[in-house]
């Protein structure tokens, strides 16, 4: 077997092979520790349980009383996600103004940021890290113990986690925007808020709104998941139906959930198109 001439050999071939070997060496112990055994899904007992579970879905529950309850829970889920996002925005916007170096007034004179401003900025950044490092499901689990069952825990949980996420990403977007307009306003005596509204925001509005809408879509999905720990909404009703082994009710709520996410995705796509 003749070897390829040097001019036809892929110079990155050895690197790709080495990368694959390293990835396998790292990934295999993780899969072993996670007890990843997908073949269990295909043994006789699992297949029988799967068939029985799916068979209980048909026909989906469609009584008027049940559909009214599902409609109310769906609206509660949307309200929970929207209220949580609104509170998150109220916290994220002022923290973004502090955390963004692009909006610093003290750096314009000497090129250095004042120590007190740097300390405050680092404090806010650490607060954003703290908020987003705890998933909303964990916040909901903790808050249910404090405020009790219901959507209040879900609203606060979304507000806390998404405040950290929005503040971090907003600051990154503003830092990567064109600094010319913002710097010009600050040098001519403009305040931080005015520089943000008339300098940084117009250049980054499309990206900021696009990410905000995406997070609202994520908040709707998260609201359903938080219902499983007692935070109300469609998820709590799904949890109750699963405990009662009511597959027909679960099927209806799954269909509603899929339609809800599809509608949220449609609204998100429409807003993005209007911003382009």
Predicted regions and their residues:
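C-terminal transmembrane helix and the adjacent membrane-cytosol boundary/short C-terminal tail
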Residues: 210, 251-276
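Membrane-cytosol interface at the C-terminal ends of specific transmembrane alpha-helices
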Residues: 142-145, 149-200, 206-215, 266
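Glycine-rich helix-loop "coupling/hinge" segments at transmembrane-helix boundaries
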Residues: 145, 221-257, 276
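Alpha-helical membrane-interface segments at transmembrane helix boundaries
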Residues: 71-79, 121-131, 213, 217, ...
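Generic hydrophobic transmembrane alpha-helix motif, especially the helices
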Residues: 63, 117-157
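Membrane-spanning helices that line or support transport/gating and their immediate boundary helices
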Residues: 93, 97-101, 169-176, 180, ...
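Hydrophobic positions within alpha-helical transmembrane segments of bacterial inner-membrane proteins
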Residues: 81, 85-93, 97, 137, ...
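N-terminal, non-cleaved signal-anchor transmembrane helix
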Residues: 1-86, 90-94, 98-119
